[in-house]
Amino acid sequence: MALTIDRDEIIGTLKREIQEITDMQEFQNLKSKYLGKKGLIKSLMNSLKDIDDVELKKEYGKSVNELKEELETLFDEKLSELKEKEREEKEKKNWVDITIPGARRKIGKENLITKTRKEIEEIFIGMGFSVAEGPEIENSWYNFDALNTPEWHPAREMQDTFYLSLDKEKLLRTHTSPVQVRTMLKSKPPLAIISPGRVYRKDELDATHSPVFHQVEGLYVDRNVSVSHLKMYLEVFAQKFFGNKVSVLLRPSYFPFTEPSFEVDISCIFCGGKGCNVCKNTGWIEILGAGLVHPNVFQSVNYDPKVWQGFAFGMGIERVAMLKYNIPDMRELYKNDIRFIENS
């Protein structure tokens, strides 16, 4: 039995069908029709068993294989065409016009408390001070006794201090002065440090008070230190922080750990010292407390007060930030109001 293959008709039909292919699914269906397990080529190959003549069988098999190669070539070309089309469509879909202005990302801003703390640190570091830190949970000896604060002092009362034990030995520090005590106990004079950090007092939260706030305290120890040294350093700080035109005034006060003690005022930055509502028409605004280190404090840390003298000061970070940035309510510093943060 002799079989013939109409090669031209098969090729022509495939070319017409393949032209109509638009996606990969249609491509796979058509390829299976011709080259699949139940496709045309498989059917033609199965016809070999019906040919008895060996030479005719060889010739027929050769013709089928040649046809198969031609079909595969046509399918390969179409596959490349479809892949290129897919690539172009994907590029078109993902195309970005680089000439369009980009959307600027919002950049975070430091909270004013952090910003102010860094400003203060940079000023004092520039004057030769180093930064020291210590624990917020303190022992009463470091927080009170070593700082010449006797048991009868009002600061040690329950209504002012957060005690963590019934014997009042553990507490949340009420100032960062304990850091100064710890530093002096492990360091030999002379020294100059500032100790920034969180402190805790039993205050109601309002426009000017908070049970948790931030301080920067300073300590300078050397020979022959006097009030004039204290005032000089504070003037440099005030002028760098608030502006060159600021003057400093020391008013006598009382702190158990300094003698003499002072409240430190600056000339009003809002009226230039002429008098206004902010300074209550005095021309001066209080910014911190200071004084010469009490001899009893030096004795607590084994410094000889006859050889060494020093000055100490302490300021509320929130207070000086409120003054510098004209913020009327301390509570604004603790809110996450993005409008306030962006404008500060």
Swiss-Prot record:
Biological processes per GO annotation: phenylalanyl-tRNA aminoacylation
Membrane-spanning parts: none
CDD domains given in the database record: PheRS_alpha_core (cd00496)
Needed co-factor(s): Mg(2+)
Cofactor binding notes: Binds 2 magnesium ions per tetramer.
Binding of Mg(2+), residues: E259
SUPFAM superfamilies per the UniProt record, alphabetical: Class II aaRS and biotin synthetases (SSF55681), tRNA-binding arm (SSF46589)
Keywords for this protein: Aminoacyl-tRNA synthetase, ATP-binding, Cytoplasm, Ligase, Magnesium, Metal-binding, Nucleotide-binding, Protein biosynthesis
UniProt xrefs under Pfam families: Phe_tRNA-synt_N, tRNA-synt_2d
Coiled coil: none
Molecular function per GO: ATP binding; magnesium ion binding; phenylalanine-tRNA ligase activity; tRNA binding
Enzyme class: ligase
Enzyme Commission code: 6.1.1.20
Assembly description: Tetramer of two alpha and two beta subunits.
Protein name listed in UniProt: Phenylalanine--tRNA ligase alpha subunit
Gene that this polypeptide is encoded by: pheS
